[in-house]
Each structure stands twice: as C-alpha cells, then as structure tokens.
Regions:
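Metal-dependent amide/peptide-bond hydrolase catalytic core
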Residues: 1-32, 49, 53, 237-434
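Acidic/His- and Gly-rich active-site-bordering loop/insert found
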Residues: 2-131
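Short beta-strand segments
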Residues: 107-109, 166-168, 196-200, 220-222, ...
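Acidic-glycine-rich active-site phosphate/pyrophosphate-binding loop
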Residues: 111-125, 208-220, 355
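Short glycine/proline-enriched loop/turn "hinge" motifs that connect secondary-structure elements
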Residues: 115, 157, 208-214, 272-277, ...
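Glycine/charged-rich beta-loop-alpha catalytic/anionic-binding loops adjacent to active sites
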Residues: 121-134, 222-225, 358, 395-396
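Acidic/histidine-rich catalytic neighborhood of metal-dependent amide-processing enzymes
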Residues: 129, 134, 138-212, 254, ...
Length: 434
C-alpha cells in the first residue's frame, strides 16, 4: 500500500455518528475492552512472530491459512472455514443473529507476502520491535484482526450486525487481489457484506477511501530473427518495442484524475550480432479513473500496431530480396487488473472512522491507494483500508520491521469503528447515519 495525497472538501462528520462514537467510548463495556488490549500485548506479539515464521508467498498461502484457521477456532469464532482459494473465515454474532439475508460487517487482512517460499524467515524481537520479512506487511494487519476477534469473544459487547473476520489470500503482486475478487463474486458474501474494513500494514494515520486502479501488461513481439549481416532487413522486435514506447509515452495524461504509466521491464536479444527472434516489455498503467485506464490501454495497443506496421514496411524497403520469412507477431498479455473506485464523501463508513479519529484525538489523512478495498469500492460498496496500529518500515525488504508502540491506539480505532458500523447497542444499525 503506497498512499497518495488526501481527499479534499470532506463534509463535516455527521453529528449522529459522532454522538454514537462518544457514547460507545464512554461505556463500561468498551472501557473494559480497552483494558483487555493493554494487558494482552504479549499474546499479540507472540501471534505476530508465529505467523511471520510461516512462508506465505503468492499462491502459496495454505500453511499460514491453516495456522490462522486454528487461531480463529482457539479464540472461539463461529463457522471457521477455508474456501476454495484459501481465504480463511470466522464469524462473531450480533444480537440480530446469523439469519438468512443478514448483513455483515467484514474485518479483513491479507495473509500473503511478497517474498518467495525460499526466503529465510529470520524473525527476531528486540524490545518493542520485531524484525524480519512480513512482520509489518501484513503481520501487523493480521495480528490486529486476530486481537479484535479474541477481544470480542472475551469481552461481550452488544451490537446488532454480525461480524465476519477474513484472512484473505492474493493481495500482493501477481496475486492481483484474487482473494477479495473471489469473496465478492460468491453468492454467500457479495450482497451480504454491508461494510468492509481492510487492515493493511502498520500505523493509525491514514484512511484509504479511494481505490487506485492499475492495469499491467506483458508485451511480447516475435519475428523471424537472423544474423545481423546476412539477414539484414528482417524486422527487429526490439526496434518495434522502441518505436511503440516512443509513441505511447508521448500520449498526454490528465493530472485530474491523476493517471500514470511506466515501462518497468524490457528484454530481448541474445547477442550484439543477432537480430532478436523476440523482445518483451512490462507496462504499468494506473489511475483513479477506469475510463482513463481503458483509454491508455487502447493507446498502448494502437502504438504497438503502428510500430509493427512501420517496422514491417521498413524491413521490406531495407531488403526487398530477403529470403527469410518476414512475419511479425505481437501479443499483449494482461498480468494485473486492479479496479478503481471511490467512496462517497457522505458514506457512513467514512463518517464512522473520522468520528472515531476525532474521539481518540488521532490525526489521520483520507487517501488513495491500491489495497484489497479496491474490490468492494469498485462495486460501489462501502469499504476503507486502515493500518493495524504501531509503526513499521522496510516493507517488501528483508530489513522490514514493526514497533508495537502505538498498537493499542490502532486497535481502539478498529474496535470503535466496527462497533459503530455494527450498531453497538442500537437496534437501528445499518442505517445511513443521518
């Protein structure tokens, strides 16, 4: 998650939501829950270290998923199960029960990491800090989710809507949000999750309410190849990519909605005196607008078509007598598609988290980023992504770290937000808040 600058022109927090949050924070039950958080930090750290020592590369999360399912059972969640793609579920009832057609508040955290299975997982603790791959992203998020689940089963808090806890797979890299895609495409969940709170990484200073979309492609150009002397004139895939890149990168992009592109990888050829048989590149397109991403994708495809035509014609002019076949083939392979979306400024979930931050005197910015929340936001559903508290750094490196100082604030923030959305002590849960 790499946030960009905050939303502007947010409306005032709905007074009714602010009153609800203040009432919740002052209740004896919630004060008891806050005390539970203070006394259980050693358990949270133990869980975080245990989990971080279990490899969970993209498409290889099963061992960590099994560990999380066992922890869900251990803390007492209901209906613990693992779905077809590896997502882990556990439920906690509201006083309205689990009836047919019931709406849920979802708390999720991705269990995968960017690191391959062969990565040494040398997790160590030094004071309040943990060090090692994945301890923050997303060790902090999963630990926070597990801590909230354990708290709710230990300190009974009355709320209307049931909660579903989800450890989802496939957030990082080539996972391409596959876990959340699966959840929001299944009949069981796509229409029954009223609000989604996604926990991603450490911190308590951001609220992601806008989904940064991205489309990624691998482009492969193939030609006849040959010797640089005897086969001079044959179309050159590297030249085709160079021409396409020159045309594509000259395309204008808007500053609002912000839209970007990048050529991140380019490969081709075997030696200086060989005409390559193939060349490839990887392209990243990002925007907060689906329409802008589609426009840039079309621009890329047109640039490639033009480059193929130009190089084919140039090859014919260079050597009208060439004996080698001159056919050129260009393939554009999608390797990532994260949809864009935006939470309405008046959405109840945004009022709730902002009211909680005001209650806790916590300064947080509303931002955009690419997270698991992209999926529900792109479907027009209410979702945010926030951190699991504490602080962290070195994400996606072997030097990653997490500091538990400040975790308690993050957990209070998560708990109050869930209770506000689930209608704690309020039979009118699930309304608009106004």
């Amino acid at each position: 998650m790499s946030p960009t600058p905050p939303h502007a022109d947010l409306p005032d927090i709905a007074p009714a939501v602010q009153r609800d949050v203040a009432r919740l924070a002052a209740s004896p039950e919630v004060r008891s829950a806050f005390n539970w958080l203070r006394t259980h930090e050693p358990q949270l750290t133990q869980w975080q270290m245990e989990m971080a020592r279990i490899a969970a590369p993209p498409f290889g999360e099963s061992a960590r998923g099994a560990w999380l399912a066992e922890r869900f059972r251990q803390v007492g969640l209901d209906d613990v199960r693992i779905d077809d793609v590896g997502n882990v579920f556990g439920s906690h009832p509201g006083f309205m029960g689990y009836g047919v057609g019931q709406r849920y508040v979802a708390l999720s955290a991705h269990i995968d990491t960017v690191f391959p299975a062969s990565t040494p997982l040398n997790i160590r603790q030094q004071g309040s800090r943990l060090y090692g791959p994945g301890v923050s992203d997303n060790g902090a998020g999963v630990t926070a989710m597990l801590g909230i689940a354990a708290l709710l089963r230990s300190v009974r808090l009355r709320h209307a809507l049931p909660l579903v806890f989800i450890g989802n797979v496939g957030e990082e890299g080539e996972g391409d949000l596959r876990g959340m895609r699966h959840i929001f495409s299944t009949p069981r969940w796509k229409d029954s999750i009223a609000y989604s709170v996604v926990l991603d990484g450490a911190g308590s200073d951001t609220v992601v309410a806008e989904a940064l979309g991205s489309r990624r492609f691998e482009v492969i150009v193939r030609g006849p190849g040959g010797h640089s002397w005897s086969d001079f004139g044959a179309p050159n895939p590297v030249v085709i990519l160079a021409k396409a890149i020159d045309t594509f990168t000259a395309a204008p992009v808007p500053t609002g909605p912000k839209t970007t592109f990048n050529i991140g990888v380019i490969r081709g050829g075997t030696s200086v005196n060989s005409i390559p048989e193939s060349a490839s590149m990887k392209v990243d397109i990002r925007s907060t607008s689906m329409a802008e991403m589609e426009r840039l994708e079309q621009t890329l495809r047109l640039a490639l078509n033009r480059a193929v035509e130009d190089e084919t014609m140039a090859a014919e002019m260079r050597s009208s007598l060439q004996k080698r076949p001159s056919g050129v083939h260009c393939e554009v392979i999608p390797i990532g598609n994260r949809p864009a979306g935006e939470l309405a400024a008046g959405a109840r979930i945004l009022h709730a988290i902002r009211a909680v931050d005001a209650q806790l005197n916590n300064a947080a910015q509303v931002q955009r980023a690419s997270t698991d929340a992209n999926i529900p936001l792109s479907l027009g559903q209410e979702a945010i992504a926030i951190g699991g508290g504490g602080s962290g750094g070195g994400a996606h490196t072997l030097q990653e770290w997490f500091d538990s100082n400040g975790r308690e604030l993050g957990l209070k923030r998560i708990l109050l937000t869930l209770l506000a959305l689930a209608g704690a002590g309020d039979s009118g849960a699930g309304g608009s808040g106004e």
